[in-house]
Amino acid sequence: MNWQTKDELLALLTSLVQYESITGSKGEVALAEYLYFILKDKPYFQKHPDDVTLHPMDDGRSFLTALVKKKNVKKTVLLLSHFDVVDIEDYGEFKHMACKPAELLSSFLEKKELLPERVRRDAESGDWLFGRGTMDMKAGLCIQLSMLERAMNGHFEGNLLLITVPDEEVNSRGMIEAVPALKEMEKKHDITLTACLNAEPMFEKFPGDQQQYFYTGSIGKVLAGFFCKGIETHVGEPFSGLNANLMVSEINRLLELNADYCEKVDGEVTPPPVNLMQKDLKEAYSVQTPHTAVTLFNVLSMKRSASELHQMLLKTAEQAAEEIMSNVRKKTQDFQQFEPFQPIERDVTVLTFDELVSRAKKRAGISETERALNYAFANRGELGDRDFSTKIVSELASLCKEDAPLIVLFYSPPLYPAVSSKDDQLIRNTADQIKHYAAERYGIALREVQYFPGLSDLSYLQLEKQEVDAYTSNMPLFNRGYSLPSGKNQALYVPVLNVGPAGKDPHKWTERLYMPYSFEVLPDLLSFTISALLKQSESAGQLLREK
């Protein structure tokens, strides 16, 4: 199988999409093995069998690397992708065809009345490939495999190292475990990672956006949790306690879509915080009011530091604490017209997770606190990272009953530090060349965007120079189930760039790839980009990195 023409690329992509590689599934494991075997079948890797490798991960999954190296050449472009996809439940009656592009399109055309108007037009045009993973991001992987094949045939004046990972859609464990391996490969093969070229798809800024983009960085994300411990009471005596659901609702009111958290950098703006999870922690119905609840928010960043954002979130928690008691006092006064009574005066305490650990040790003792933590970790069961983080906070808060009511600010995996190579000289020069080439060759006005908005594994390629202690010191699972590469022996600093395919509706049942651009323009554009990165002096990007 060759991977150069439009038909060949379509066949390759279809073969990748047909693997239901949903994060955490058997299909995710199987696709890594399939990629390994189709690469091993190439004459180049038959001659260099040790240069294509499946790297087993701690959880039984694997990531794959494939190196095509020129003799006595160090400069290497890293091609990054992920091969997992989100689930297919949203396809509904089309679920069984979600990973079969041809069958899915036929079914869509048979039931056009079920399609939104712009989706129907695209389906009828014949220019769009539908199916889970067609856009995000198996098309990008497909084109990168095509570039690797060109490298096998001596097309580039330098080395290509392809790495494709699982779990990008959930916790990015694949990339987190891959970073130390990349560091080791640099030493083993005597190569220098000059730049990383990701191929995540370009995202529409609004429905119907016709502009085409490439990215010189990737947006940052933290998952901020607020654990609320109220005071339980019977529903017949509501003023004797404090409902934890009331507490989280106030945090939600203050934080959801709060434009104060939006960050503007060079005309780009982060979306405001949005809630991703909210629930009380009662396990069964009763007439006891909920006394523990949690709410988790997706908060995005660009240049804002971890410590600055942490302080903003802490301030919001403190504001919520004041508003909660102000609200309760007002409603208490409203009720006193019916039944005069002396209300219980109390304030809501606000702690960070790190402070909660110290408070628990003070209240219950160091040994009891450690025992509670060890027991929780030993009996995690099937809890995911979000729920287990909440459980750890809850266990520690239970040792601090006298401090209730309280709000605890903590962080849960995954953490995506923002990265930008806009000012790296190598990336700056290459970006300018890409725009000029696209305009001259194809009449396309490619627009440069500093931060890829969809979150990506590029976040883990500049950890050597990133400070995230404000998050990790308040993350219950950090270094106990979730970690980030750190130190000079593990962390990397690599300039980044994202040039990817065009499509619409990622993570929706109408996900689709625009084939004319992705199969006819992108391969040439990506080839040009790789050549531009390799042809420039190795020192061009090195000077800034050493400062």
From Swiss-Prot:
InterPro entries (alphabetical): Peptidase_M20, Peptidase_M20A, Uncharacterised_RocB
GO MF assignments: hydrolase activity
Domain of life, per lineage: Bacteria
Stated family: To B.subtilis RocB.
Protein name: Uncharacterized protein YqjN
Organism encoding this protein: Bacillus subtilis (strain 168)
